[in-house]
Amino acid sequence: MSTNDEENGTVIEVKNVPEPSPETWYSVFLRQASVYGVAAGYCLSASLLSIINKWAIMKFPYPGALTAMQYFTSAAGVLLCAQMKLIEHDSLNLLTMWRFLPAAMIFYLSLFTNSELLLHANVDTFIVFRSAVPIFVAIGETLFLHQPWPSVKTWGSLATIFGGSLLYVFTDYQFTIAAYSWALAYLVSMTIDFVYIKHVVMTIGLNTWGLVLYNNLEALLLFPLELLIMGELKKIKHEITDETDWYSLQVVLPVGLSCLFGLAISFFGFSCRRAISATGFTVLGIVNKLLTVVINLMVWDKHSTFVGTLGLLVCMFGGVMYQQSTIKKPNATQEAKPQEQDEEQEKLLEMQENKESNSVDIKETLKSEEKL
């Protein structure tokens, strides 16, 4: 269709824009199947990761080396997916790597205190103190990042976590000074880690996959230092001289699956955040945490008492309340960017939590084997 411009005497072509066709049942089915498939993949990878890690560490009893291979797989996976145009990440830059180095070092410190805590206490104690981290992170954000004090609803959730922690501590029959000293050290290191990581996310200017790449790559570069400090290098050299069956299928298969599932939980976790609501993602997280507690009760022989387990569940419930109270609902366009920054932070912290969960499974398996 064309019209004449009376002033200029030119003909203006007016194109009829076709209206978007309504969705067919097939397209709706594919979209819903994609959402449920991503959610199922996240639950499957998160719940099976601990079992596969236990299998891998029994066949390859070197937690530092296994964790390093998981770091390598995650970093290589990001680079490969970027080459295939599936994701986008920030390019590697030496100056940015130098700026990110303190965050990687603090992350390693949190893993070290995590390992020492597991050597002196059971998994229940770890879960309780891990659940108490948001209390001190909220205070640290206010004091050092100039964030507003939490709302009344958030304080209520933090108080629930604190109450559950006290209930657990007062009924812990395995209480020792050494265990709770390392628990406090873990609490402090994790608080510093989370607050500093948020500072990095807010100031360093990397997107989600860029943060994942830098975090895993620099953690991998720090691995030789851990190898020397923890004495794992001597053990590996001893095994090499004994010509063990490292290259057999019974070793390569569980180690390979452990690395692949570590990457899968990151991929499905980020995909879930895009495909479902924050509430739905929280529900999936609850299911995975409950499965962790159930597996812990079924596999290990030393647990907290019934009241202690109840306190642990109260802590988890408080954590759910805390997640819900911090979900932001933007009312205007200018609020979109801060919310995106918060999502970037949550995704990186989720990645760190996954790495720590891997360390929990690996260290606890070794501890149980030593008792046997």
UniProtKB/Swiss-Prot annotation:
Membrane topology: Multi-pass membrane protein
GO (cellular component) term, any one: Golgi membrane
Keyword Methyltransferase part of the UniProt annotation: no
Keyword terms, alphabetized: Antiport, Golgi apparatus, Membrane, Sugar transport, Transmembrane, Transmembrane helix, Transport
A single BP term in Gene Ontology: nucleotide-sugar transmembrane transport
Region (Disordered): 331-372
Residues spanning the membrane: 33-53, 60-80, 92-112, 125-145, 155-175, 177-197, 209-229, 251-271, 280-300, 303-323
Localization of this protein: Golgi apparatus membrane
InterPro entries with a match to the protein in the record: Sugar_P_trans_dom (IPR004853), TPT_transporter (IPR050186)
Basic and acidic residues compositional bias, start-end: 346-372
Pfam families membership: TPT
GO molecular function (one): antiporter activity
Presence of keyword ATP-binding: no
Tissues in which the protein is found: Expressed in rosette leaves, stems, flowers and siliques.
Family (UniProt): Belongs to the nucleotide-sugar transporter family. GDP-Mannose:GMP antiporter (GMA) (TC 2.A.7.13) subfamily.
Function per UniProt: GDP-mannose transporter that may be involved in the import of GDP-mannose from the cytoplasm into the Golgi lumen.
Protein name, UniProt field: GDP-mannose transporter GONST3
Lineage: Eukaryota, Viridiplantae, Streptophyta, Embryophyta, Tracheophyta
Gene: GONST3
